[in-house]
Amino acid sequence: MGDMANSSIEFHPKPQQQREVPHVGGFGCTLAELRSLMELRGAEALQKIQEAYGDVSGLCRRLKTSPTEGLADNTNDLEKRRQIYGQNFIPPKQPKTFLQLVWEALQDVTLIILEVAAIVSLGLSFYAPPGEESEACGNVSGGAEDEGEAEAGWIEGAAILLSVICVVLVTAFNDWSKEKQFRGLQSRIEQEQKFTVIRNGQLLQVPVAALVVGDIAQVKYGDLLPADGVLIQGNDLKIDESSLTGESDHVRKSADKDPMLLSGTHVMEGSGRMVVTAVGVNSQTGIIFTLLGAGGEEEEKKDKKGKQQDGAMESSQTKAKKQDGAVAMEMQPLKSAEGGEMEEREKKKANVPKKEKSVLQGKLTKLAVQIGKAGLVMSAITVIILVLYFVIETFVVDGRVWLAECTPVYVQYFVKFFIIGVTVLVVAVPEGLPLAVTISLAYSVKKMMKDNNLVRHLDACETMGNATAICSDKTGTLTTNRMTVVQSYLGDTHYKEIPAPSALTPKILDLLVHAISINSAYTTKILPPEKEGALPRQVGNKTECALLGFILDLKRDFQPVREQIPEDQLYKVYTFNSVRKSMSTVIRMPDGGFRLFSKGASEILLKKCTNILNSNGELRGFRPRDRDDMVKKIIEPMACDGLRTICIAYRDFSAIQEPDWDNENEVVGDLTCIAVVGIEDPVRPEVPEAIRKCQRAGITVRMVTGDNINTARAIAAKCGIIQPGEDFLCLEGKEFNRRIRNEKGEIEQERLDKVWPKLRVLARSSPTDKHTLVKGIIDSTTGEQRQVVAVTGDGTNDGPALKKADVGFAMGIAGTDVAKEASDIILTDDNFTSIVKAVMWGRNVYDSISKFLQFQLTVNVVAVIVAFTGACITQDSPLKAVQMLWVNLIMDTFASLALATEPPTESLLLRKPYGRDKPLISRTMMKNILGHAVYQLTIIFTLLFVGELFFDIDSGRNAPLHSPPSEHYTIIFNTFVMMQLFNEINARKIHGERNVFDGIFSNPIFCTIVLGTFGIQIVIVQFGGKPFSCSPLSTEQWLWCLFVGVGELVWGQVIATIPTSQLKCLKEAGHGPGKDEMTDEELAEGEEEIDHAERELRRGQILWFRGLNRIQTQMEVVSTFKRSGSFQGAVRRRSSVLSQLHDVTNLSTPTHIRVVKAFRSSLYEGLEKPESKSCIHNFMATPEFLINDYTHNIPLIDDTDVDENEERLRAPPPPPPNQNNNAIDSGIYLTTHATKSATSSAFSSRPGSPLHSMETSL
């Protein structure tokens, strides 16, 4: 210790063993000493603690804290600790400045083209050839221009430049506000993170950022450790340290062998208490974080140089593969200095379960690329036609010769043609689409927070709208999670109510009180109500709270028992987990013997009982026949009432021979049953209605629970998941596995496809069963469309299922940190109704995007045709470049804001899910787009060719190069904008509804934007002048423009009258690429194609997925870092790391190890994002939670994760009606079809079948 102290801080004298030396703040150890201590592991660390502090209690004394009482909750003391030892917080790197965002916006290819064209146009406008040369060059423009007009030629170029500046500023502001929004979301996620500490002897939940050195923290199963610490007392504690050490095996921690607990690691089993020794940048995780960021500047420069040198092809080949696959497009890699990094990722990619890209993202990607290509082709054709027309007319028809002095004049024309071509491109590309997606998602996420949905992955919000199946937990989600004991079996008597204490013998009562008080987490308590008349507060595990409440109902108290036998005197604890389904605690008796108390699921624990207490409290033999009688007469009736049954038992061991405590099967056996209690967990009153809504919306709800089959069936019936007369399956985990596995024990998809369509309840299930079910439903090919599955989970071992599902919901109250980390959405109230709201918001996002597409594509179709046709016929576009920038970039931005903020309505839940293959642009929408385009084109071409006669004004066609704005073309522009404004109102409805004004005043943003856009248009037309190529219009002309605009609403009614079913010729657009449509190679090629489109087309096209993934990109960095070794450990383990990398393909669970150098640059790049981790414990918010880090302890039953695109055989016809004794018999059996559709059209009527679901046809 002295060596380390001297090497770390030279001015400190070498401390003597166990001798306190006063340090800064009066504490007995320095920050450097604690940092040095936390670098050690195992026996080395124990020796250091003994040499320097004597033991852990000595360390606590040095830190002026009590191992049992914790810190005094004194503000001054806490602040002093933060000043000396640091805060549990890593300062984030400053977000990009507004100027940096402006510079990014300027990198857009289309804008650069416009800038160049504008500058060239500006330069040439100042060149005027002599008069005689001008005559020799010819007046190919169709008219002469006077001197004043020629002098004003610079205005067009300047106006385009000004418009580009406006667009850049708007884009930069949008990016800035978006980043600000994401920072707010990140801040919200941070605030949700709390940890349990002891202060003043009281258990408190404090934000992780409020932890200080010296805090006594409670550690329990499922926690993500927020700081470094030393274990004071632990019960069967196992930690997953793979995020720091790369070791995939769980590490057993104990106060006498390895007490070192590190931040960022997961508690996979057990519980305990630790003293916090390092926080923030001084913790092991924080040290690595800081070191990785330190060299970021240099690495960033290297990256920039590398990016300049790399070609587009090379950069596209080094795409980083997102490991949860939930993003639409593969993002650019966060480059590392190590070439092997990429290869290692590629090797691992096949082993990591991937979610498919989100439905909307996949469709938008395809649509954006298609539109972009069409725009490029149209603009190229336009330029070619204009140039050929000019060349043929000038040099062939007029027979002129190219004179050197005429070159600037001709170039001026070519520049004009080029600008027109760029205008067509600008018009074709839906610039507002990415913004509409971002706004819609951001708006929905913000509103969903109020509906108790904390969205961690933005795309999950939209994916939820397509959900076809929800696999829900029971406890706390469908039920209130306020449990109470309502029935019990004690002393050979079945009590339907709480028995009077006098009815029980003292021995039974004492044993019961001790068994419950001691064999429960000491952090679980019943506290007095906060308000008079309210219910007592339940703190901790709800099942244990119910048992403690049972003691209080028997007029006894658990607290004196716990004070008599404190937690640190417990001899051995077998903590609860999903495999054991029980908890056991061993205490030493006064005579030197031992007593074991055990509680757990009644069917499991009763099998281990060989005795039972009779009415006198005496032991009586408990034979298998007795157990069967008890199951039939006691447990099944309780379960049929919807009660959870818990058995409480004990066993005594003599002092003569101490058993082998590690042999759990031997120890927890030969038990004596004290009692069986029935615990009621009432169904939430709002849940049955929520499930009815789901069923109406075409979503099948399945309950997956660890409870008894009878309990689960009773609760499912109360919730409405199963109904009388419906053919369904209720299976236990064992029966489920028997049905889906072959003789070799392997899962067969065909077998699974026979089970899941009818399955409604899966009882006595393990987390592995849940993962198998979710994977089986997702991989199934029995239907026309791939199922979109949502799953709820709260336990550490639910991680695989949460990650595998399309949308994973974690419980905000009861959920572990690991479950939250693996999820997409956190239910802050643990309520199923919040999931229904998420469905509604998801569908609303989909509709909002479709509304905007309907509006945007109408604008695009009309503008492209007008610009293309007008340019080819009149050699000039009726809609000028500046006007197009206004319409397409600014006005559409407002439209995206207006249409993307429409609030959801209950009617969204009255239709079936869209499904993965349902196009973004339905036939009804295509009818609307083309119908309105026909109206608008008819009006515009009429105005273009005969408008001057109708209004008795000069024609604007074939005007000279720099002629002043004409009233003719201004009327065309104004009419075009008015039609778009009123069509924006039409676009609010996309399913053929007639009342387009329905609910319009419930969206003030929409009303404000429509009126605001109208006001700006008035200003542009009346005062825009030459910059906007506008001439002021008279009142009469304005009224005509408005009249034509209002005609859009009337025309919309005409279009709504035409039945879509009659228009067979209409095609749909924006289909999502199906999972079975493409091979892996084709998918890879598609990604390459998208990457090229990224470079060729306007940045706006890919802004939508950049917005969706902005948080995920940063989280990827944290995930990469999590799989790294500590800075010191990385050096020590370098050789073992390399050997493991060679063997990685041979491991069923790859060990994720990274050398620090490999991601200095990537981590630093992530840190400059505004949503960078402001606290190192934001791992809860990390989207990249790798199942592989712990999957080996939850063995996956098959290995089909490797290839998700593998062709699967169609399932044979469904089996005959269920004969399993776990199923409820039904007089009416509904036929399950081999192919199903997620849309309502798939359901045909069948007499005598009053019920329906996604798996049954009516």
From Swiss-Prot:
Residues 1-22, 298-328, 335-354, 1204-1258 are annotated as: Disordered. The chain crosses the membrane at residues 98-118, 156-176, 365-384, 418-435, 850-869, 880-900, 921-943, 962-983, 1003-1024, 1035-1056. The keyword Cell inner membrane does not apply. Residues 1097-1114 are annotated as: Calmodulin-binding subdomain A. Keywords: ATP-binding, Calcium, Calcium transport, Calmodulin-binding, Cell membrane, Cell projection, Ion transport, Magnesium, Membrane, Metal-binding, Nucleotide-binding, Phosphoprotein, Synapse, Translocase, Transmembrane, Transmembrane helix, Transport. Residues 119-155, 385-417, 870-879, 944-961, 1025-1034 are extracellular. The keyword Magnesium applies. The modification Phosphoserine is found at S8, S1126. This is Plasma membrane calcium-transporting ATPase 3. It comes from Rattus norvegicus (Rat). The lineage of its organism: Eukaryota, Metazoa, Chordata, Craniata, Vertebrata.
